[in-house]
Amino acid sequence: MATLFIADLHLCVEEPAITAGFLRFLAGEARKADALYILGDLFEAWIGDDDPNPLHRQMAAAIKAVSDSGVPCYFIHGNRDFLLGKRFARESGMTLLPEEKVLELYGRRVLIMHGDTLCTDDAGYQAFRAKVHKPWLQMLFLALPLFVRKRIAARMRANSKEANSSKSLAIMDVNQNAVVSAMEKHQVQWLIHGHTHRPAVHELIANQQPAFRVVLGAWHTEGSMVKVTADDVELIHFPF
């Protein structure tokens, strides 16, 4: 058996091929797993569990079917869907996890996270993240009428796209010191994360021992998952 990890699907109505690919994944590979972990940015945007978007209801039902089949499903918030709440988690049968979680998998201690907190060189983003994660600000935003939230979210996405266009790729990648610090804080030799859309397996030194950082790919033109078994940790790409 295997434990599966995915991230950065950025599901939205404008990308039906990705949605269809994810549904096939849920109906196939996911049903064979010991557990499924979604490490953030499942959706391109999330403005509240009360959004009646049919895509959200469709995804909740599909994930719930996996959970009901006996495969536990877990979710860590990303930078796009950090407002996904308990209502959607309940509807989809997912368990919400903290932003950093250590798993014991087949004899390995594995740290999982979305990955945006590792991009400490991007000071502008980290300042924005700290602001929008303030509970009082989230409560205020979620109390606004839905149409107002949609306008704010669209403007924020446009601003983010414009800001990122002028940033270097290095700034938007993880900071190596932040990676080592996180792994040593949790005393792990394995880290799995998403966010950067740069799939790879990196070797490093943490806790004065060889360590590995596995980065999930985004679901743009193909699927991406990490498959952890007793024998191996594999980064796998597959067609929709």
UniProtKB/Swiss-Prot annotation:
Protein's membrane topology: Peripheral membrane protein
Pathway(s) annotated for this protein in UniProt: Glycolipid biosynthesis; lipid IV(A) biosynthesis; lipid IV(A) from (3R)-3-hydroxytetradecanoyl-[acyl-carrier-protein] and UDP-N-acetyl-alpha-D-glucosamine: step 4/6
Catalytic reactions of this protein: UDP-2-N,3-O-bis[(3R)-3-hydroxytetradecanoyl]-alpha-D-glucosamine + H2O = 2-N,3-O-bis[(3R)-3-hydroxytetradecanoyl]-alpha-D-glucosaminyl 1-phosphate + UMP + 2 H(+)
SUPFAM superfamilies linked to this entry: Metallo-dependent phosphatases (SSF56300)
Residues annotated to bind substrate: 79-80, 122, 160, 164, 167, 195
Xref: CDD domains: MPP_YbbF-LpxH
UniProt keyword terms in alphabetical order: Cell inner membrane, Cell membrane, Hydrolase, Lipid A biosynthesis, Lipid biosynthesis, Lipid metabolism, Manganese, Membrane, Metal-binding
Domain of life: Bacteria
Record GO terms (molecular function): manganese ion binding; UDP-2,3-diacylglucosamine hydrolase activity
Cofactor note as given: Binds 2 Mn(2+) ions per subunit in a binuclear metal center.
Enzyme class: hydrolase
Xref: Pfam families: Metallophos
Function comment: Hydrolyzes the pyrophosphate bond of UDP-2,3-diacylglucosamine to yield 2,3-diacylglucosamine 1-phosphate (lipid X) and UMP by catalyzing the attack of water at the alpha-P atom. Involved in the biosynthesis of lipid A, a phosphorylated glycolipid that anchors the lipopolysaccharide to the outer membrane of the cell.
Family listed: Belongs to the LpxH family.
Protein name per its UniProtKB record: UDP-2,3-diacylglucosamine hydrolase
Originating organism: Escherichia coli O139:H28 (strain E24377A / ETEC)
Native organism taxonomy: Bacteria, Pseudomonadati, Pseudomonadota, Gammaproteobacteria, Enterobacterales
Originating gene: lpxH
